[in-house]
UniProtKB/Swiss-Prot annotation:
CDD domains per UniProt: AdoMet_MTases
InterPro entries: PABS (IPR030374), PABS_CS (IPR030373), SAM-dependent_MTases_sf (IPR029063), Spermi_synthase (IPR001045), Spermidine_synt_N (IPR035246), Spermidine_synt_N_sf (IPR037163)
Family the UniProt entry places it in: Belongs to the spermidine/spermine synthase family.
Cystine connections: none
Pathway this chain belongs to: Amine and polyamine biosynthesis; spermidine biosynthesis; spermidine from putrescine: step 1/1
Name of the protein in question: Polyamine aminopropyltransferase
Cellular localization per UniProt: Cytoplasm
Residues of the PABS domain: 5-241
Organism whose genome encodes this protein: Xylella fastidiosa (strain Temecula1 / ATCC 700964)
Catalytic activity: S-adenosyl 3-(methylsulfanyl)propylamine + putrescine = S-methyl-5'-thioadenosine + spermidine + H(+)
Entry keyword set: Cytoplasm, Polyamine biosynthesis, Spermidine biosynthesis, Transferase
PROSITE patterns xrefs: PABS_1, PABS_2
Summary of subunit composition and partner proteins: Homodimer or homotetramer.
Catalytic residues (positions): D160 (proton acceptor)
Amino acid sequence: MTTNDTWFTEHFQTTGSAIGFRVTGKLDEVQSPFQKIEIYNSTDWGKLMVIDGALMLTSRDNFLYHEMISHPALFTHTAPKCVVIIGGGDCGTLREVLKHPDIEQVTQCDIDEQVTRMAEKHFPELCTSNNDPRATLLFSDGVAYMADCPTNSVDVIIVDSTDPVGPAKGLFNRTFYESCFRALKNDGLLIQQSESPLALLELIKEMRHEMSKAGFKAFKTLPFPQPCYPTGWWSVTLSSKQPNANFAFRQTDAQTKPFDTLYYNAHLHHGVLVPPPFIAHALGE
């Protein structure tokens, strides 16, 4: 990462590329016990949240990520009631999950309370569901939380984490996935952010391999645009305990959903289930 008076620029060694945003200044900064969190104001993308030098979200395009990490799983499950979010400290995913009126309980567990406090201060539009009576916000280690989670108690687990380094590294291995597998009901689903399919397909393959070793039987990686992330293209990976899962979704419910979205809809969901040939070939689909 480099900054000067007018630009925030992030360099990506894994992709040999960089992305920059014109900024008017730094609005806030806090060093938590886990990471450094900064907030910048940009000229065209609203506010930026940066963690340890890596851009996490912008006001302008965060809806893409938050909608795609939540609604595909919730409309694929036949009747989700109990949801766990691991990570998700900016609370945008929590907001999207609680748009579903039949959700009864959401527990969000993020290791760093300061991420949520900075989001509440600078991105209040993401935090509108923080006081929903169905929501419980915990600030502790997500790996430990899932290890202690009761067996067969959760319908959908959403892993809304940073990249697989630092505090989030433990969210990408077999031990964590075994905890998720045990906590999910038989028809439960796991969905996790899975980086750029254009640049990091090997990481996605390794994730799916670790999930498979933990017992998951079927997988579907869903790509979507994300301009502020490396390559401008991101993905989430959906996993099922059922060997014959085809990830059919409740299309009528998605078409008649009683809430607004900016990106997700039933037609898009149908299309994203058909991967581009290069992804299908690499992942053996």
